A protein has these predicted regions:
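Solvent-exposed loop/turn and edge beta-strand elements of beta-rich ligand-binding domains
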Residues: 2-316
Length: 316
């Protein structure tokens, strides 16, 4: 009986140690929301530094000490699906955020340009930020930076700490300037994700084609034109983007592949089918469930103490 008792105690103590180790390994601690984050934009193309490139930074969401986000007032009116968003999801959503910025002429929180080494350094407070770069001409090349979203401070998963010095490297596309007046085309395609509930969709939606941040043309997409449109005879020496007027009951996501923009509207109507989607939201990783582990460890410890006291009482 004594051996069984000793094994039980050892097993419980082992559970406590494993649980405590798990807590230590997965909790990066609280974010110091008053501390500045040093952000460096490092802009290169094929290992060549791009100087004189202008970047604008927009704060999309504030963050608290527990890495919980709250969308800022500037972006609160837009249908932003902030729940269950991983870092890759946010980057896929960056073009949509850029379309909001262009359509409504939102002012950036920070602006600057890269130096001779292709770097721009600034300091910001913790939060979720959209970074938008402008087209940049250097010698006979034109460079375009893909917009991206960054959560600050950064997360060091190996050391389980928050990093308050972060370097971000935007994806750059480069092409030689055309020697003649080259004309291009742009296409927009609408996709509905609503369980094929066509009766719930609006009869048409409004799409704006924007040129360097200004509205160039406006069209209506509907079933008659198969929810698509093509613009021809556009000047290649400008940056083109589409935006969509908000559709009630739907979120929107704009992506670009080559010369085609895809505008996807996803229904926000809740269904009764249980969702099995895993929460991969970057700011929540390893931060919200550690209190439950601590309670588990405390509970196991209480059980061990209780059994020890009971055995002591029985032995008296």
């Amino acid at each position: 009986m004594k051996k069984i008792w000793n094994r039980m105690v050892c097993a419980m103590l082992l559970c406590i140690l494993v649980t405590a180790a798990t807590i230590s390994a997965n909790a990066a601690g609280m974010i110091d929301t008053n501390r500045d984050v040093a952000l460096t934009i490092s802009y290169q193309y094929n290992a060549t530094a791009i100087s004189g490139a202008k970047f604008d930074i927009y704060k999309v969401a504030d963050v608290d000490a527990y890495a919980q986000m709250k969308v800022t007032d500037h972006f609160a009116e837009y249908p932003i699906p902030s729940d269950h968003m991983s870092q890759d999801d946010w980057n896929d959503f960056a073009t949509t955020l850029k379309s909001y910025v262009w359509q409504d002429s939102l002012k950036p929180d920070f602006s600057g340009q890269t130096d001779g080494t292709g770097n721009w350094k600034t300091t910001v407070k913790p939060g979720l930020y959209l970074v938008v770069g402008s087209r940049c001409d250097v010698n006979d090349m034109t460079y375009t930076a893909s917009p991206f979203v960054v959560f600050l401070p950064g997360s060091n998963e190996e050391q389980n700490t928050w990093e308050y010095a972060v370097t971000a490297s935007p994806k750059a596309d480069g092409e030689k300037k055309p020697s003649t007046d080259t004309r291009i085309s742009r296409k927009v395609l609408k996709i509905w994700e609503d369980g094929d509930k066509k009766t719930s969709r609006p009869k048409d939606i409004t799409i704006h084609l924007m040129c360097d941040g200004n509205v160039y043309d406006t069209v209506k997409l509907n079933a008659e034109n198969n929810w698509r449109h093509t613009w021809d005879n556009l000047d290649q020496n400008h940056e083109w983007l589409v935006s969509e007027d908000t559709v009630s009951g739907y979120t929107q996501n704009i992506t670009q592949e080559g010369t085609t923009f895809t505008v996807k509207n996803t229904s926000t109507t809740k269904t009764t089918t249980p969702s099995k989607t895993k929460d991969t939201s970057l700011p929540r990783t390893g931060l919200l469930w550690w209190p439950a582990l601590a309670l588990m460890a405390g509970g196991l410890l209480c059980v061990v103490i209780g059994l020890v006291r009971r055995r002591g009482a029985d032995g008296e």
